[in-house]
A protein has these predicted regions:
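Bacterial Sec-dependent N-terminal signal peptides
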Residues: 1-28
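Acidic, glycine-rich segments characteristic of secretory precursors and extracytoplasmic regions
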Residues: 19-67, 116, 180, 488, ...
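Elongated scaffold/linker segments in the mid-to-C-terminal portions of large proteins
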Residues: 39-41, 46, 50-57, 73, ...
Length: 498
């Protein structure tokens, strides 16, 4: 990765030296060496490890890399921005695509901030002995989360687990490491978090910070992702068992009795989302706040609404660009027969018009509390419905159909749908992964879900039949940005086909 993305503070310091080499000891200069002097300094840096989440292509527009890439959500105008938005659902990405470069760099920026924080945690003293380890636990969770997305989307990637000390260290680290090593780093970080004094679950005021249950969910998701990767077929049983252990532990720490006790809208409603008992980890935004508001609702809005009461924002004139709509009016996601009873369709899906044609859109990101373009809709990264449906996945992948249906039916019945019974084999698998698409539409999970549920051959045939004629074996990984490959062509070779 580019030097500026691995060690931004070091580069900034080097740049300062080169411009003013005669004044190297100015006591007023803030450098890596003298910035960390108080516990408050560390707290500020810890807050900064979360900031890259809000970069334009980390979580803010993650759906392009997940739901759109899986053709669950479609960008309907191929002419916008030179076709870059449309390239995801068309599977026509290149190594020069700016979204790919932005995402790759934003994730590594987040990882670098975590490494810098960990490096300097012992530079100061703390009022409470547990504070230091709490900060390290947060950094390790954020770092592990970044590596989960990198290994899932790019395959073998550079694995940087400490702050590089020199430019030579930076270039030495810019070498792709096997997926197995990356997954192990994720598990090691999650294990550290679980042994730390970090809270099991955060309060409403701190819901945007890491917690132990979030680490359990991440650990389970990574184990399940690795278990279903064809490279690790021989370890599938072992990895699924590890995933179940973490899922069981996460479920045991919930603050509610039954999933059906929580309304399907609680995780997303502006009034309830920050204190929702279903939410485990989320990216926080503040409605109407210039510095802390987000633009998420605008990425899912149609050009016009069939029902203005279901608009995503208060002032619909703020919206002008085409965005992500449910494919084929959501017919495959929400069957017509279920639409009058599925509470998710009734409460979280709306209809409108794009280009003169009817479309459906997700209403999970709605903020009518402000007339500004700074919205308060949080991005929910992990919630308990995910724990439930991953339990169903693990049960399916280990041949336990009865338990798979038990967990699957928890989500279906909460949504107002009938329980399933008597399913096995591919019918059970399809029921689980179709339910995941319905439950998490617009939440940035579909692509990883498809990879866990289906073989490369099945997905290739599916996407080609669905209209993605260009889809092929290369598309199971994103391209490494060209701007990174040229820094070390031998150590950072491009993924095949790009």
């Amino acid at each position: 990765m580019k030097l500026k993305y691995i060690i931004p503070i070091l580069v900034m310091a080097l740049g300062t030296v080169s411009c003013d080499f005669l004044d190297l000891s100015d006591p007023n200069k803030v450098t890596v060496g003298n910035f960390y002097q108080t516990e408050a300094d560390i707290a500020n840096v810890c807050a900064g490890i979360y900031q890259p989440f809000k970069d334009s292509h980390y979580f803010t527009r993650q759906d392009y890399f997940t739901d759109s890439y899986a053709r669950v959500l479609m960008f309907l105008d191929p002419g916008v921005a030179g076709g870059e938005n449309y390239a995801f659902c068309a599977h026509s990405l290149t190594n020069a695509h700016s979204f790919i470069s932005n995402r790759y760099n934003s994730i590594y920026k987040s990882i670098d901030r975590c490494n810098i924080l960990i490096k300097h945690l012992d530079d100061v003293t703390y009022e409470k002995a547990t504070t230091r380890d709490t900060y390290e636990a947060e950094a390790r969770f954020v770092r592990a989360l970044g590596y989960f997305y990198l290994v899932s989307e790019f395959g073998d990637v550079p694995l940087v687990l400490s702050k590089p000390g020199s430019i030579n260290d930076v270039y030495a680290a810019n070498v792709r490491q096997p997926k197995e090593k990356v997954y192990q780093a994720i598990y090691d970080d999650c294990a550290w978090v679980l042994a730390s004094p970090l809270a099991d679950l955060q309060s409403a005021n701190d819901c945007g910070r890491a917690c132990k249950v979030a680490a359990l969910v991440l650990d389970a998701k990574a184990h399940l992702q690795q278990a279903t990767d064809p490279v690790f077929t021989a370890r599938k049983a072992e990895l699924c068992a590890a995933a179940k252990t973490s899922l069981d532990a996460a479920w045991a720490k919930k603050f509610f009795n039954k999933l059906e006790d929580i309304n399907v809208t609680d995780a997303f409603d502006l009034e309830t989302q920050k204190g929702s008992k279903e939410n485990i980890f989320q990216i926080n935004y503040v409605s109407g706040d210039t510095n802390n508001g987000g633009s998420i609702p605008l990425y899912f809005a149609p050009q016009s609404y069939d029902d203005e009461s279901k608009s995503l924002v208060r002032d619909v004139s703020k919206y002008s660009s085409p965005c992500l709509m449910l494919k084929d009016k959501g017919d495959k996601i929400f069957p017509e027969a279920d639409r009058t009873k599925d509470l998710r369709f009734i409460n979280l899906i709306g209809s409108g018009i794009f280009g003169g044609s009817p479309v459906y859109y997700t209403r999970k990101y709605t903020d009518k509390a402000t007339t500004t373009v700074y919205y308060g809709s949080d991005i929910v990264v992990f919630r308990y419905a995910d724990v439930v449906l991953m339990q169903a996945e693990v049960a399916y992948h280990t041949g336990d159909a009865a338990n798979a249906m038990k967990w699957l039916n928890m989500v279906r019945q909460r949504a107002g749908l009938d329980a399933v019974s008597g399913l096995s084999g591919n019918n059970l698998r399809d029921a689980i992964y179709e339910e995941r698409i319905r439950e998490f539409v617009g939440e940035g999970k579909a692509w990883e879900d498809y990879l866990r549920g289906y073989s490369h051959e099945e997905l290739t045939n599916y996407f080609k039949a669905d209209g993605a004629a260009m889809f092929g074996e290369k598309d199971f990984l994103f391209p490494i940005p060209y701007s990174q490959v040229i820094l070390n062509p031998e150590g950072l070779p491009q993924n095949p086909g790009y």
